[in-house]
Amino acid sequence: MKNILFMTHLDDKFIDGALVMIYSMKKNVKDFMEYPMKILHSSAISDLSVENREKIKKLVPHVEFEDIYNQSYMDAPVQYPKHRVAFLSLECFRPTEYEKVFFFDCDMLCIRDISEGIETAPNEYVSGCGGSIDDINCGLMVIG
């Protein structure tokens, strides 16, 4: 396995997009199956069913799932409770056993190989796409 973790968060509402995104990465990212992958979900906020986990495992048999429980995410004020699942993206900063973490949202499509950009992103920074000089779009980040 390569030492760059592919990571996302997911619940049942976004399974169709996730399956398309993962399939598109599998098709376009060089050596995709050599990257470890972890999918975060939260049974306390918005769960990912066993059935949907199995659908993902058919695409990426080595995928790991982690059920996150963090009381802060449940207590934080939000306009719409369904948006609490977005707090799980903060968990992509926790893994320290990898050289980098590539965090992606499941509402995207990979249309060409992005591995060079991931592998050459600076190790000492968080690289994102979009945004401005003051902020980034947190839907795609490489954490070094």
Describe every region a protein language model picked out.
Residues 1-144:
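Glycosyltransferase catalytic domains, chiefly GT-A lineage
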